[in-house]
């Protein structure tokens, strides 16, 4: 289950009236290309913050704060927040909004006007421990992978995305929704669904439901996390899902050099060559690379190559 413990909110949260007033004051019109749909329901932002489990000890990286609904709830939780906003108009107004609704809490907010995909470690004064984000479908996967790679300090990610994207992120091996994002996120941690969000809590109202997804980074990674190893694992994932309906033996022929060598490598990794790539877990891909000479059996984490399966299959809550 998702973490739901929290404290009583004391900061004034934004409602429908405040959201509309702010937009009118700024002469702001939401841009569909940026996925600008803003939450105006206090119970929803409370729920997102509770699902994230953030506390006073956290430095939260909020992606896409918009008009500030979720920002205020995160600050009221006691967290320090760095808000990354791509829209310069919204970024310039956020601190004023927080000051008006929280009095003395604005000192715990830093605003960065930047595309999240261009964000680097040196852009932040301190390493974030958590991410909370409301992401449009077209940037959700690249943004999540970029943040998990760029900021190894992040221990938990809580993201609100379109329901269809949420299903893909947390899908089980072999399911229709299971794909490249499902596997790659599990390289970093356990992935789970945390429920649905109605379109009626947003302005403008989107046409689809949203879903909450939480990613908990492994406390101790069962495999190396350096860029070189990750890229080689991800290469295998991309190969398998480029031809997801093929048998693993046939999908990996070019990578292995021949059909027989492909079968031998799969068997060495305890994978049936007749299995389709869409059924393989992150553990399978890592094991395939290792048993094919892709890395030493002794890893940088001190874990054996035959580490138990902790791929973090999704669970609904």
From Swiss-Prot:
UniProt keyword terms in alphabetical order: Cytoplasm, Methyltransferase, RNA-binding, rRNA processing, S-adenosyl-L-methionine, Transferase
SUPFAM superfamilies cross-referenced by the UniProt entry: S-adenosyl-L-methionine-dependent methyltransferases (SSF53335)
Main location: cytoplasm
UniProt entry tagged with the keyword Ribosomal protein: no
Record localization: Cytoplasm
GO molecular-function term, one example from the UniProt record: RNA binding
Catalytic activity: adenosine(1518)/adenosine(1519) in 16S rRNA + 4 S-adenosyl-L-methionine = N(6)-dimethyladenosine(1518)/N(6)-dimethyladenosine(1519) in 16S rRNA + 4 S-adenosyl-L-homocysteine + 4 H(+)
Broadest EC class assigned to this enzyme: transferase
Any one Gene Ontology cellular component term annotated for this protein: cytosol
Xref: PANTHER family: DIMETHYLADENOSINE TRANSFERASE, DIMETHYLADENOSINE TRANSFERASE-RELATED
Protein name: Ribosomal RNA small subunit methyltransferase A
Species of the source: Mycobacterium tuberculosis (strain ATCC 25618 / H37Rv)
Lineage summary: Bacteria, Bacillati, Actinomycetota, Actinomycetes, Mycobacteriales
């Amino acid at each position: 289950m998702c973490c739901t413990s929290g404290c009583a909110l004391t900061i004034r949260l934004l409602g429908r009236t405040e959201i509309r007033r702010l937009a009118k004051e700024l002469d702001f019109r939401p841009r569909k290309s940026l996925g600008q749909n803003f939450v105006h329901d206090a119970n929803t932002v409370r729920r997102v913050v509770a699902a994230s489990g953030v506390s006073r000890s956290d430095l939260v990286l909020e992606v896409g704060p918009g008009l500030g609904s979720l920002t205020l709830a995160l600050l009221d939780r006691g967290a320090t927040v760095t808000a990354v906003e791509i829209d310069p108009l919204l970024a310039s107004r956020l601190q004023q909004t927080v000051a008006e609704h929280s009095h003395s809490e604005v000192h715990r907010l830093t605003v960065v006007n930047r595309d999240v995909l261009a964000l680097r470690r040196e852009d932040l004064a301190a390493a974030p421990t958590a991410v909370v984000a409301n992401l449009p479908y077209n940037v959700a996967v690249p943004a999540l992978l970029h943040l998990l790679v760029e900021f190894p300090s992040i221990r938990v990610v809580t993201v609100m995305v379109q329901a269809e994207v949420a299903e893909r992120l947390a899908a089980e091996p072999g399911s229709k929704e299971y794909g490249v994002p499902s596997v790659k996120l599990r390289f970093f941690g356990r992935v789970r669904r945390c429920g649905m969000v109605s379109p009626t809590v947003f302005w403008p109202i989107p046409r689809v439901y949203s879903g909450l997804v939480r990613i908990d980074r492994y406390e101790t990674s069962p495999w190396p996390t350096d860029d070189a190893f990750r890229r080689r694992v991800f290469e295998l994932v991309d190969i398998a899902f480029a031809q997801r309906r093929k048998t693993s033996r046939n999908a990996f022929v070019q990578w292995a050099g021949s059909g027989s060598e492909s079968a031998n490598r799969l068997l060495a990794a305890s994978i049936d060559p007749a299995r389709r790539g869409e059924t393989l877990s992150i553990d399978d891909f890592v094991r395939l690379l290792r048993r094919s000479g892709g890395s030493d059996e002794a890893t940088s984490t001190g874990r054996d190559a035959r580490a138990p399966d902790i791929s973090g299959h999704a669970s609904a809550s």
